[in-house]
């Protein structure tokens, strides 16, 4: 999980979602997981 000021999809399987007011990227590849904060 990477915590970044700006989250962007890295590959085609990355999905940008909003959870509890946080923008997150979820993906099949665990290295692509990101969270804004």
From Swiss-Prot:
Look up the domain of life of the source. Answer: Bacteria
State the UniProt keywords alphabetically: Ribonucleoprotein, Ribosomal protein
A GO CC term attached to the entry: ribosome
Q: Which GO terms describe its molecular function?
A: structural constituent of ribosome
Q: Which terms under GO biological process does the entry name?
A: translation
The record's annotation in InterPro entries points to:
Ribosomal_bL36, Ribosomal_bL36_sp
Which family is this sequence assigned to? Belongs to the bacterial ribosomal protein bL36 family.
Q: Could you tell me what this protein is called?
A: Large ribosomal subunit protein bL36
Organism of origin is Symbiobacterium thermophilum (strain DSM 24528 / JCM 14929 / IAM 14863 / T)
Q: Which gene encodes it?
A: rpmJ
